[in-house]
A protein has these predicted regions:
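Signal-transmission coiled-coil "S-helix"-like helices
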Residues: 1-11
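Metal-dependent catalytic cores of enzymes that make or break cyclic nucleotides
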Residues: 9-11, 18, 25, 29-267
Length: 268
């Protein structure tokens, strides 16, 4: 009886270990839509290759053989070959283009302010070249630069999420967002296929762009498989956001408290 019970315990322990291994592999596959069940396919391919090596009667594998414990080791190793991806950030696993990276988009916004300052300087020198009073033009340029510097400092402070964003601050954000800058390059070139699908129709260049914008490509739709139906068997009652991500610049800068959108909070 003791022997039978011991065997049963060992078998149950192996089954539990196997379940943990496959759960880990399934979790890694679920981290990215691009792996396509990679962790589940590798064990099958590994067994086919190992079986072919064992069956070889000539060549370099003619003396190759695997015992019962060896097969178990191959099985476990194949299922765990990608376990390191558990600690790999999703933006690395899902990297779709060479320059894609997780970074603070305040750098993009700062560069747009730099463009506006440069445009103001060019306009100043063009006015002077056209006969305008140099002192007045320089004074107007200095005032314009000071305003742009102050507005960027305000946007940057909103980005930090340390203070509550009240309606007055949101109204000012919208006023700043209404500024425009001139884009002369196609923003559909070099982007990932997913981002390209989210973009709106191509526009004729050059085009005036809002300084801060909520664009179609900022809205990442939530797949039907990620929705929890109201009649789910677990009885969960969750408000599932319609979007997987909402990366709109104005939307995120207008977050009332903290740094997270509703979509971010749901994901956490």
């Amino acid at each position: 009886a003791v022997s039978v019970e011991t065997r049963a315990l060992i078998r149950a322990q192996k089954q539990l270990f196997e379940s943990f291994i496959q759960l880990l592999a399934d979790a890694i596959d679920a981290k990215s839509p691009y792996t396509g069940g990679h962790c589940a396919r590798v064990p099958e391919l590994t067994k086919l290759l190992a079986g072919a090596a064992c069956a070889a009667t000539d060549g370099p594998f003619r003396d190759f053989t695997l015992g019962e414990e060896d097969w178990e080791a191959v099985h476990i190793a194949a299922w765990l070959h990608d376990c390191g991806k558990v600690t790999t950030p999703e933006y690395i696993v899902d990297k779709a283009t060479k320059l894609e990276v997780l970074y603070d988009r305040i750098h993009e916004i700062r560069m747009r302010f730099e463009v506006l300052k440069r445009d103001a300087e060019i306009a100043c020198w063009q006015a002077i070249a056209g006969g305008a009073d140099e002192a007045a033009a320089r004074a107007a340029l200095a005032a314009g630069w000071a305003l742009l510097d102050e507005e960027f400092a305000f946007v940057a402070a909103c980005n930090e999420g340390g203070e509550e964003i009240d309606p007055a601050r949101i109204e000012r954000l919208q006023q700043i967002a209404a500024r425009t800058w001139l884009r002369t390059l196609d923003d559909r070139l070099g982007v990932s296929p997913d981002e390209l699908r989210r973009k709106g129709p191509a526009v004729a260049l050059p085009v005036l762009e809002a300084l801060l914008a909520d664009k179609p490509e900022h809205r990442v739709a939530r797949g039907a498989d990620e929705l929890i139906p109201a009649d789910n068997p677990w009885g969960f009652r969750l408000q599932v956001p319609a979007l997987l991500y909402n990366r709109g610049e104005l939307t995120n800068l207008s977050i009332g408290r903290g740094t997270l959108t509703d979509e971010d909070r749901y994901k956490i």
